[in-house]
Swiss-Prot record:
Keywords linked to the UniProt accession: Coiled coil
Polar residues bias locations: 1-13
Function in brief: Regulator of cell size that promotes cell size increase independently of mTOR and Hippo signaling pathways. Acts by stimulating the translation of specific mRNAs, including those encoding proteins affecting mitochondrial functions. Increases mitochondrial mass and respiration.
Comp. bias regions, Low complexity: 77-91
Leftover remarks: Was named 'Largen' because overexpression causes cells enlargement.
Entry superkingdom: Eukaryota
GO biological process, one term: positive regulation of cell size
Alphabetical list of InterPro entries matching this protein: Largen/INSYN1 (IPR027997)
Region of interest: Disordered: 1-27, 66-91, 114-160, 239-304
Biased composition, class Pro residues, residue ranges: 120-129, 239-261, 277-289
Descriptive protein name: Protein Largen
Disulfide-bond pairs as recorded: none
Length: 304
């Protein structure tokens, strides 16, 4: 029994110890929570003060701007219902008291703003039109340049009245086509009227003169080559003694004639061939001495 009695109090002591410690811990935790709540409440009070200050500032700003119109009953009820606190309602009432006189100016201001916005809008279109006008002269400038180049081409081609005939259009291919046609027509008319200008290209190319001359009139070459050779053969012994009194001016240039046919293979013959076809075209059966005299004189002019 004694053992049991001893065991009971020993068992009761540890049972009483833990609940006392737990109570003290709970009390400490409650105190901490209360302190935290007090801090939160203090923060909430500060926030409420700040909100009131913000509302007062909003009221002062709205009262200075005077943006409110006459409020109808429905608008009043809507604003009151929409307000979440009494501070908003009080602020609205304060604003209404300050703005007793109804203001119809706000609707006038937006109209003025619209007019101000409409005025700057029309000026931008003129600058849009001006660049288009600036582009037009740019297009005119390149059209003027090809005309100048065509003028130079016409000058090189030998057409004095060509640039005046060219239109001032934008198409540049038309004057080029006219240029291609004009020299061809001139070349076609020249051999029909006078074959003298053919000596120009022959002077530039001295080695292919026979080939070019055969292309123009192959029939005349066979006739006059033999006659010209005979003329030059006769002229060699005749000129040194000076037996020919009628041909005074051709005597000094005649010594230059023999080296040309010897070196280039018929330079003097080619020049003489270019000029004589004028007479055979008009008079097919000319006598031998007549073309010889003309050949000598014209050959001297070409060599000079």
């Amino acid at each position: 029994m004694s053992a049991k009695s001893k065991g009971n109090p020993s068992s009761s002591c540890p049972a009483e110890g833990p609940p006392a410690a737990s109570k003290t811990k709970v009390k400490e935790q409650i105190k901490i929570i209360v302190e935290d709540l007090e801090l939160v409440l203090g923060d909430l009070k500060d926030v409420a003060k700040e909100l009131k200050e913000v509302v007062d500032q909003i009221d002062t700003l709205t009262s200075d701007l005077q943006l409110e119109d006459e409020m109808t009953d429905s608008s009043k009820t809507d604003t009151l219902n929409s307000s979440s606190s009494g501070t908003t309602a009080s602020s609205l009432e304060k604003i209404k008291v300050q703005a007793n006189a109804p203001l119809i100016k706000p609707p006038a201001h937006p109209s003025a703003i619209l007019t101000v916005l409409r005025k700057p809008n029309p000026p931008p279109p003129p600058p849009r039109l001006t660049p288009v006008k600036c582009e037009d002269p740019k297009r005119v400038v390149p059209t003027a340049n090809p005309v100048k180049t065509n003028g130079t081409l016409l000058r090189n081609g030998g057409l004095p009245g060509g640039p005046n005939k060219i239109p001032n259009g934008d198409i540049c291919c038309i004057p080029n086509s006219n240029l291609d046609k004009a020299p061809v027509q001139l070349l076609m008319h020249r051999p029909e009227k006078d074959r003298c200008p053919q000596a120009g290209p022959r002077e530039r190319v001295r080695f292919n003169e026979k080939v070019q001359y055969h292309g123009y009139c192959p029939d005349c070459d066979t006739r006059y080559n033999i006659k010209n050779r005979e003329v030059h053969l006769h002229s060699e012994p005749v000129h040194p003694p000076g037996k020919i009194p009628h041909q005074g001016p051709p005597l000094p240039p005649t010594p230059h004639l023999p080296p040309f046919p010897l070196e280039n293979g018929g330079m003097g013959i080619s020049h003489s061939n270019s000029f004589p076809p004028i007479r055979p075209a008009t008079v097919p059966p000319p006598t031998a001495p007549k073309p010889q005299k003309t050949i000598l004189r014209k050959s001297t002019t070409t060599t000079v």
